[in-house]
Amino acid sequence: MSIYDIKVTDNKGNEVSMSDYKGKVLLIVNTATGCGFTPQYEGLEKMYEKFVDRGFEILDFPCNQFAFQAKGSDEQIHEFCTLNYNTKFPRFKKIKVNGGDAAEIFKYLKEQKKGRIKWNFTKFLVDAEGNVVDRFEPTTKPEDIEASVEKLLK
């Protein structure tokens, strides 16, 4: 199985195949709007704007598993991120990242880069061939990931 075999649901309820992202470098992040790390949205958006034209995407998966910090509907979360951080990268339906009912995408990511997700804003870097090449803890700021992204872009 590869990451491209997985299907996810966007924040409007549409099914999206991860194969739509073949050939792109991806940063997949579990997020929350009420977390101490929420201001990382600003750095994520800056990185997105810097690299999107070179084949880079950030995939935002809100998660309410950690201290219930992603409250509200998918629409409310999207509105919060757009109004407060002007984010333009793709946002998906709120999911779980740990446990038996974790989203398939996060089960896969954790198989590739071992370990439970401990908090919001854990980041997984995927190369253009679909390989999960790195995992960054929530304390890693987006600007500290830019060099790793740059190396993967053609």
Briefly describe each language-model feature range.
Residues 1-19:
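N-terminal "domain-start" segment that seeds a small globular fold
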Residues 10, 30-34:
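Amphipathic alpha-helical repeat scaffolds
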Residues 24-25, 34, 38-64, 82-85:
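Conserved helix-turn-beta segment immediately C-terminal to the redox Cys motif
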Residues 55-72, 88-99:
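Thiol-based oxidoreductase modules, predominantly thioredoxin-like and allied folds used
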Residues 75-120:
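Short, internal strand/loop/helix patches
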Residues 104-107, 111-154:
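Thiol-/selenol-based redox modules, centered on thioredoxin-like
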